[in-house]
UniProtKB/Swiss-Prot annotation:
A Pfam family hit: CheB_methylest
Protein name: Protein-glutamate methylesterase/protein-glutamine glutaminase
Swiss-Prot/TrEMBL GO biological process terms: chemotaxis
Entry remark concerning the domains of this protein: Contains a C-terminal catalytic domain, and an N-terminal region which modulates catalytic activity.
Record domain Response regulatory: where: 4-121
Keywords on record: Chemotaxis, Cytoplasm, Hydrolase, Phosphoprotein
Gene from which the chain derives: cheB
Keyword Phosphoprotein part of the UniProt annotation: yes
PTMs per UniProt: Phosphorylated by CheA. Phosphorylation of the N-terminal regulatory domain activates the methylesterase activity.
Family membership: Belongs to the CheB family.
Length: 390
């Protein structure tokens, strides 16, 4: 059965190009088009597509408002097209908070030309998101006001989706099928959360979290549960363009009780602080003078993921053998699997998100299938269990 897609853009040229690229894949059928957000909401209810591609800036109703309405009326996985600017990044993060599942950069030159890589990326995202035939993961709304830097304490602070006056967001959402390289349906049953390996107090020096599709919302839910006095440093690897990571680090910092910022080369990894790897480059850890620091370096041409979870995990295995917790959250592909194997050989624990709460069960499925996962946890429990570490 083909994945049924609805294409939404106020530009007729872009609608035609996106439709053409999608329908070159035998597994995708474009069942409708819309020129603005209002039409998108109507078409989503009428056509009930498996996935929607959505522009942000449109007349009558913008893409963010349309996503919000679609999630209220006819929850459907939505792939946003985003400009590669700081403002575009913040708008895209707002769309993800509203319920969109993922985003893809919107470059006129790429879409107007016959860019094979862009076409393949678009097709893969639509197939992955549309394959679940259901609703996307719960949104993680922004707080009413930024966290006061001087008030980061053990005071109670609601996690995203649990803010005052809002009902908690259900942790489960539409699970989309992973792309071809990963076959989680054949994966052996992973250990139940309550039977997984427990971590002794003082046994760790570092937490490394890796994620891709669905990661921005997942990270907001996980990181917002960590207390201000969290005893470990956190390195976050999120597949994201370079222009997006500064805005995303700011968003996390607004939500969290610990400090979150974009990593710079040579930054010390300190307890109670999370560093987000910059997009478009590689990030790892190294030890200088007995202190763990971040190493930021250019990616080689053969490295597809920039930043790469595998590279970060491998560096943690080298400099924190047996003392780095690797966490793999929702995402396409298998990035993190090989690095998790290296971590595991040093005696380090590995956690992964479960299938039911993953937007794309690719990366977590890969580590589960490889047999290196110690604990398989629902998304909200990942943050809860991290908060218990001492």
């Amino acid at each position: 059965m083909k994945v049924r897609a609805l294409v939404v853009d106020d530009s007729g040229f872009f609608r035609r190009r996106i439709k053409s690229m999608l329908e070159e894949h035998p597994g995708i059928e474009v069942v409708g088009e819309a020129a603005n957000g209002r039409q998108a909401v109507e078409q989503a209810q009428k056509l009930r597509p498996d996935v929607i591609t959505m522009d942000i800036e449109m007349p009558e109703m913008d893409g963010i408002t349309a996503v919000r309405e679609i999630m209220r009326r006819q929850p459907t996985p939505v792939l946003m097209f985003s400009s590669l600017t700081y403002d575009g990044a913040r708008e895209t993060l707002d769309a993800l908070d509203a319920g969109a599942s993922d985003f893809i950069p919107k470059r006129f030159a790429d879409i107007s030309g016959d860019m094979e890589q862009v076409k393949r990326q678009l097709q893969e995202r639509v197939l992955a998101l549309g394959g679940g035939r259901g609703a996307p993961a719960g949104r993680a709304p922004r707080p009413a006001a930024p966290v006061d830097r001087g008030a980061r304490s053990e005071r109670a602070r609601p996690a995203p989706g649990e803010a005052s006056g809002r009902a908690p967001v259900p942790p489960t959402g539409a699970r989309a099928r992973p792309e071809a390289p990963v076959a989680p349906t054949g994966a052996p049953a992973a250990p139940a959360p309550e039977r997984g390996q427990r971590i002794r107090p003082g046994a760790l020096r570092l937490v490394v979290i890796g994620t891709s599709t669905g990661g921005p919302v997942a990270l907001q839910r996980v990181m917002s549960r960590l207390p201000a006095g969290f005893p470990l440093p956190v390195l976050i690897i999120q597949h994201m363009p370079a222009s997006f990571t500064p805005a995303f680090a700011e968003r996390l910092n607004e939500l969290c009780r610990i400090e979150v910022r974009e990593a710079k080369n040579g930054d010390e990894l300190r307890p109670g602080q999370a560093l987000l790897a910059p997009g478009g480059r590689q990030a790892g850890v190294e030890e200088r003078g007995g202190k763990l620091t971040v190493r930021i370096f250019d990616a080689s041409s053969d490295q597809f993921y920039k930043p790469s979870v595998d590279i970060a995990f491998a560096s943690a295995a080298k400099y924190c053998p047996g003392k780095a917790l690797g966490v793999v959250l929702t995402g396409m592909g298998a990035d993190g699997c090989e690095g998790a194997k290296l971590l595991k050989r040093t005696g380090a624990p590995i956690w992964s998100q479960d299938e039911a709460t993953s937007v794309i069960y690719g990366m977590p499925a890969a580590v589960a299938k490889a047999g290196v996962t110690d604990r398989v946890l629902p998304l909200d429990q990942v943050g809860e269990e991290l908060a218990k570490l001492r």
